[in-house]
Amino acid sequence: MQKSCDENEGTPQNTPKADEGHPSEDPPQQAGENLQASGENVREETDGSLRGEPAEPSPEPKEDTPARHLNPEEVIRGVDELERLREEIRRVRNKFVLMHWKQRHSRSRPYPVCFRP
């Protein structure tokens, strides 16, 4: 049975209750304040997880990117090779486009076109 309008005005129906097991917004703010108050370094805080725990060290050391160890001549040779390959791809693509156009627009069909009266 439905309640009257007067009974429904005071209580919103779709608001979640705080005691349903949903954590409130205050504990993460307090945790951040406690980290700064305890004197921990800000860098340690950013390196750790979201909960403020320190990050686990990686099992193997991070290597530098190989591009940093190349001399400029090797980089220029690589760029020249990429440019040559792009030109070759462009030529082959144009060849296929031309072949496709010729096949579609040729007057001699591989099979006769029959029109039924």
UniProtKB/Swiss-Prot annotation:
Per the record, the coiled-coil ranges are 73-100
Q: Which residues cross the membrane?
A: none
Summary of the function given for this chain in its UniProt record:
May be involved in transcriptional regulation.
Q: What protein does this entry describe?
A: Transcription elongation factor A protein-like 8
Q: Where is this region: Disordered?
A: 1-81
Q: Which Pfam family is one of those matched by this entry?
A: BEX
Q: What does the tissue specificity note say?
A: Highly expressed in kidney. Moderately expressed in heart and lung. Low expression in brain and liver. Expression is up-regulated in nephrectomized kidney.
The answer on whether this UniProt entry bears the keyword Signal reads no
Location within or outside the cell: Nucleus
Entry keyword set: Coiled coil, Nucleus, Transcription, Transcription regulation
Q: Quote the cellular component terms of the Gene Ontology held in the record.
A: nucleus
Specify where it is mainly localized: nucleus
Species of the source: Rattus norvegicus (Rat)
Q: Does the keyword Transmembrane apply?
A: no
Record-stated family: Belongs to the TFS-II family. TFA subfamily.
In the UniProt record, what gene is named as encoding this protein? Answer: Tceal8
User: Where along the chain is composition biased (Basic and acidic residues)?
Assistant: 41-81
